[in-house]
Swiss-Prot record:
Keyword Transcription listed: no
Lineage of origin: Bacteria, Pseudomonadati, Pseudomonadota, Alphaproteobacteria, Hyphomicrobiales
Name used for this protein in its record: Heme A synthase
Organism: Methylorubrum populi (strain ATCC BAA-705 / NCIMB 13946 / BJ001)
Top-level EC class: oxidoreductase
Subunit structure, interactors included: Interacts with CtaB.
Family according to the record: Belongs to the COX15/CtaA family. Type 2 subfamily.
């Protein structure tokens, strides 16, 4: 009698997955394209913030706003609108038309990219739905992300409007953090759905590994929220030393909680805002490192490789954050720190989704080599 050894469940030679349906490859490529576009949105949005360009367009015109000023008269009208803003009167008085155009193009480009993302989402979505290429779970997930994307556009305008109020020279930090976190949540949702459409089945990781893997994207999203508060309040410019904060490892309570009511300290007290972002970064790194050790012991192979990848990225992101702080947030470092946070979130989300496992199809239908970001972690993911 000849014995055969079953292939490991986390290898590419596993049985086809239940998600291996017609059009799977096209749907997956589309989801990853959307993820790339969202990262580009975050990058352009970060540059718009860091260059102080976010308040240069004072109206929200979802359709007609796609057309920029086309002649000198159009530019004069837009410039006059900007000169009525508090930001111009308080910070940018005397800026010339050429300087205004630089600000305008950043904000216009950010909004244009948002419209492009909407088109790239809804047109293929309608086609895939009509062709029957979207399973029920995937369809519901995409509908949810579509609604969240529409809400994100509204959040973006509410954020801009907050910066146009009397006495304001920038958008409200709380609204900026919400805008950034919502974009990050959309990105995580796209990557989660894409990773679940792999062609081949995958056995779930042990339950303890799954639990911590699922926790990591949540922690990263919280840290992105805290980073949004730092960015919106410019708290990163307050203490530019590390590991101390101008000689203090932990600032005294009277510095951290001097606002009334108490809850306002978590948004308006710049010392506490920066301290929270630092402290939570340490927590994320410690959890990622501990999880990598856990995965190596309990799930050697692909899951362990992914966990070590998450740990390495979180360490690199913390190092980049420290450099950004010490250099007093130059544009390149602040932008790199924001975009690299998206890389950490993508890797953590892929790891969490694949740790859940991908069920096998009831009957094999032929397999294709998976594509997508999860393949970057190495064979067997």
């Amino acid at each position: 009698m000849r014995l055969s050894k079953a292939p490991p469940a986390d290898r590419f030679d596993a049985v086809p997955a239940a998600s291996d349906r017609p059009g799977r490859g096209a749907v997956r490529a589309w989801l990853y394209l959307l993820a790339v576009l969202v990262v580009a949105m975050v990058a352009v949005g970060g540059a718009t913030r860091l260059t102080g360009s976010g308040l240069s367009i004072t109206e929200w015109r979802p359709v007609t706003g796609v057309v920029p000023p086309l002649n000198a008269a159009d530019w004069a009208v837009e410039f006059d609108k900007y000169r009525d803003t508090p930001q111009y009167r308080i910070l940018n008085q005397g800026i010339g038309l050429d300087g205004f155009k630089t600000l305008y193009w950043w904000e216009w480009g950010h909004r244009l990219l948002g419209r492009i993302v909407g088109l790239v989402f809804f047109l293929p979505f309608a086609w895939f739905w009509w062709r029957g290429w979207l399973g029920r779970r995937l369809l519901l997930g995409l509908l949810g992300l579509g609604l969240l994307g529409g809400l994100q556009g509204a959040i973006g305008w509410i954020m801009v409007a907050s910066g146009l109020q009397p006495g304001m020279t920038a958008v409200a930090p709380l609204k900026l953090a919400l805008h950034l976190t919502t974009a990050s949540l959309i990105l995580a949702g796209l990557v989660w759905l894409a990773a679940g459409t792999r062609a081949l089945a995958l056995a779930p990781a042990p339950e303890p590994v799954r639990r911590v893997a699922g926790l990591l994207p949540v922690l990263v999203l919280i840290q992105i929220w805290l980073g949004g508060l730092v960015a919106g309040s410019k708290a990163g410019l307050l203490y530019n030393t590390w590991p101390d904060m101008d000689g203090m490892l932990v600032p005294p309570a009277r510095m951290l909680f001097d606002k009334v009511p108490f809850i306002e300290n978590f948004v308006d007290n710049l010392a506490l805002v920066q301290f929270n972002h630092r402290l939570f970064a340490y927590l994320v790194v410690l959890v990622a490192l501990a999880h990598a050790v856990q995965a190596v012991r309990m799930a050697p192979g692909a899951a362990a490789g992914r966990a070590m990848g998450v740990a390495a990225l979180t360490l690199a992101q913390m190092g980049l954050g420290i450099v950004t702080l010490l250099l007093q947030v130059p544009l390149w470092a602040g932008l790199a720190h924001q975009v690299f946070a998206m890389a950490v979130l993508i890797m953590a989300t892929v790891h969490a989704r694949l740790s859940v496992g991908v069920p096998a199809a009831s009957a094999p239908t032929g397999a294709a080599v998976p594509i997508g970001l999860e393949a970057l972690a190495g064979r067997g993911v």
